[in-house]
A protein has these predicted regions:
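A secondary-structure capping/hinge motif
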Residues: 57-63, 106-118
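Short hydrophobic/aromatic patch on the recognition helix
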Residues: 52-54, 102-103, 107
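A short, Lys/Arg-enriched amphipathic alpha-helix from helix-turn-helix/homeodomain DNA-binding modules
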Residues: 12-37, 43-46, 67-86
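Residues within the alpha-helical elements of helix-turn-helix
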Residues: 45, 94-95, 110
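Short coil turns linking two alpha-helices in DNA-binding domains
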Residues: 45, 49, 98-99
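Conserved hydrophobic/aromatic pocket- or pore-lining residues that grip, position, or stack substrates
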Residues: 1, 28, 53
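An amphipathic alpha-helical interaction segment
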Residues: 1-11
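Terminal helix-turn-helix DNA-binding modules in bacterial transcription factors
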Residues: 40, 59-98, 120-136
């Protein structure tokens, strides 16, 4: 007996591949901070196979894993560009990285600069901005 697509675990009946891709993106962004975010978890949540999920992203020239890493890296960079008290390790761990050295390596590979350079620059700017303001 053949099962309907939904019961078989595919989401072809919910607006097609474009809609499923958008749902995958939304799920990923909602769970970026989870260090255990996986392709298995995403495909189960969307009700599709891992193979189909891979195909959705592959058709757009990126793998699911690359999409997750890029999104995490962009969020980390944005957070590092805000002067504050967070360390690089705190930022990396808060966005799902489990090793600060691994984070620094892939950050440099992706952006061409070490996260410490951005962090130091923003810390200096934050101190200068704070020093230029009159006391309250």
């Amino acid at each position: 007996m053949l099962l309907p697509f939904r019961e078989a675990g595919a989401s072809f009946d919910r607006g097609g591949p474009g809609a499923l891709y958008e749902r995958a993106q939304a799920f990923i962004h909602d769970h970026l901070r989870d260090p255990d975010l996986s392709i298995d978890q995403i495909s189960m949540a969307l009700g599709c196979t891992k193979r189909y999920l891979h195909m959705l992203f592959s058709d757009r020239g990126i793998t699911v894993s690359e999409y997750i890493w890029r999104a995490r890296l962009l969020n980390c960079r944005q957070e590092l560009e805000i002067p504050g008290n967070k360390t690089i390790t705190d930022v990396a761990f808060s966005w799902g990285f489990s090793s600060s050295s691994h984070f620094s390596r892939i950050f440099r590979k992706y952006f061409g600069i070490m996260p410490s350079s951005i962090h130091r620059s923003q810390q200096r700017n934050g101190l200068q901005d704070g020093a230029a303001q009159p006391p309250a």
